[in-house]
Regions:
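Short, well-ordered alpha-helical packing segments
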Residues: 16-26, 73, 117, 140, ...
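Long, amphipathic alpha-helical surface segments
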Residues: 158-238
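N-terminal export signals
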Residues: 2-3, 17-40, 132
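C-terminal segment of N-terminal export signals and the immediately downstream linker at the start
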Residues: 11-16, 30-71
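Flexible, low-complexity segments enriched for small/polar residues
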Residues: 48-55, 68-69, 73-187, 197
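N-terminal secretory signal peptides
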Residues: 1-13
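Short alpha-helical segments used as structural interaction elements across diverse proteins
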Residues: 12-13, 17, 133, 188
Length: 238
């Protein structure tokens, strides 16, 4: 007698499906934050590819874009006397793999990297990755300062909203104080994802003295751990 057909067919998602779902969640969740287990799944995918192929081959970015992303990651979370940089922790691979599975995220990064090159060429006649370190830092500093000023202006607008002086000015709003808006948007995403990649990696977990447990699928890295990781970044204070 043959076994009865099960009433419910359970489909186990493939690794590719899981990765795609994780990538799509990045732009679907407010703040773009990933659960620890999801982030470590991405790191594991990269680790397995390196073990099989000997190296990681970018899935989305071309050679120049990937080099730029790598440079940015080590600027955002540089190496110190305790541990390596975000580049050493696998942030470029982490971001590339997620972007390859999410068209919206891919657009943010390819557009943002192109914007950085265009802006740097105005300042130094070279692409971002070819520019001097002080020029790279200066451009990123300007993005952080613009973001801070824009937030302050927005808060000031909320304070005056509804007052007699504000009535009739609502359609004007509070605009960015410069034309760096696209860069600010991109760099905000990049900082968040670089720090996410860092503190969920083996290097990052050791650095912040947090011992992850993959069983706790709903666990989110504590705010204090994020703040600790951000302290490593010269571009986090705004």
């Amino acid at each position: 007698m043959s076994d009865p057909t099960p009433l419910v067919q359970i489909e186990i998602p493939s690794r590719r499906d899981m990765l795609r779902n994780i990538a799509l969640a990045v732009t679907a969740v407010a703040g773009g934050r990933l659960k620890l287990e999801a982030a470590q799944h991405v790191h594991q995918q990269v680790k397995e590819e390196k073990k099989t192929a000997g190296t990681y081959q970018p899935k989305l970015f071309n050679k120049h874009e990937y080099a730029t992303l790598s440079r940015l990651s080590e600027l955002i979370v540089p190496a110190d006397e305790v541990s390596g940089s975000a580049k050493d922790a696998g942030a470029p691979e982490f971001i590339d793999l997620l972007c390859s599975q999410n068209p919206a995220l891919a657009n943010i990064y390819t557009g943002g990297l192109a914007w950085l090159d265009t802006e740097m060429k105005k300042l130094s006649a070279s692409t971002f990755v070819e520019a001097r370190a002080d020029q790279q830092v200066a451009l990123l500093d300007s993005l952080v300062e613009t973001e801070r000023t824009t937030k302050e202006n927005r808060q000031r607008g909320l304070m005056y909203e509804g007052t007699a002086h504000y009535i009739g000015l609502g359609s004007y709003g509070f605009q960015s104080p410069s034309d760096l808006g696209p860069g600010v948007f991109f760099f905000s995403w990049l900082r968040k994802m670089t720090v996410d990649a860092f503190y969920t990696s083996e290097i990052g977990i050791q650095d912040i003295q947090y011992k992850g447990n993959s069983v706790l699928s709903q666990f989110e890295v504590p705010r204090e751990s994020i703040d600790f990781a951000l302290q490593r970044s010269p571009f986090a204070k705004h």
